[in-house]
């Protein structure tokens, strides 16, 4: 993580030199990270669409093999192979983004910004007005609504945004800006 942290810190300073604002630098850094991860995000979208298209067939298999779970699992795996679908394909971009998130968290927690951004007095401290945590919850909810392939995840679509909003209360404002901008793109 040290190399990634150093690279993100360098990029943050580079974008600050371009913009003159660490808030804008974080937004530009977020867009750069999203651009770097775009091929994985596209792959995730395709995988989710393929899984969504297979839902009717999977439900039919579930009804047909409801008393034979082993046979059901075998048939589902055959269905995945037949349609060249990887059920874990949607997870990869999220897993790849985690090191970026952790490294950025470390950078923003230790970074001395010297100035604030908009209403924020420090990008290293939590948002005292809770505007960013609310935005993080709202944008997480919108993103989940746009990308969810499974109706059975409805409870998660409400729990996850509330959880993200809650934990964002204590995160550095710069990290929450990253999360919000990342959700929007």
Spell out what each predicted region is:
Residues 1-185:
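Helix-loop-helix
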């Amino acid at each position: 993580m040290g190399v990634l942290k150093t690279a993100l810190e360098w990029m943050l300073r580079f974008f600050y030199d371009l913009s003159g604002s660490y808030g804008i630098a974080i937004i530009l850094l977020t867009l750069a990270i999203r651009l770097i991860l775009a091929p994985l995000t596209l792959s995730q979208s395709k995988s989710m669409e393929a899984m969504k298209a297979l839902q009717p067939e999977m439900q039919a298999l579930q009804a047909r093999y409801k008393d034979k779970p082993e046979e059901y699992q075998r048939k589902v795996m055959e269905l995945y192979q037949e349609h060249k679908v990887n059920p874990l394909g949607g997870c990869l971009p999220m897993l790849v983004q985690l090191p970026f998130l952790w490294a950025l968290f470390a950078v923003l927690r230790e970074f001395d910004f010297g100035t604030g951004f908009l209403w924020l007095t420090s990008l290293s401290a939590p948002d005292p007005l809770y505007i960013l945590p609310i935005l993080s919850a709202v944008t997480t909810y919108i993103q989940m609504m746009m990308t969810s392939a499974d109706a059975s995840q409805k409870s998660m679509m409400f729990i996850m945004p509330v959880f993200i909003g809650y934990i964002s209360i204590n995160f550095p404002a710069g990290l929450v800006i990253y999360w919000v901008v990342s959700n929007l793109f």
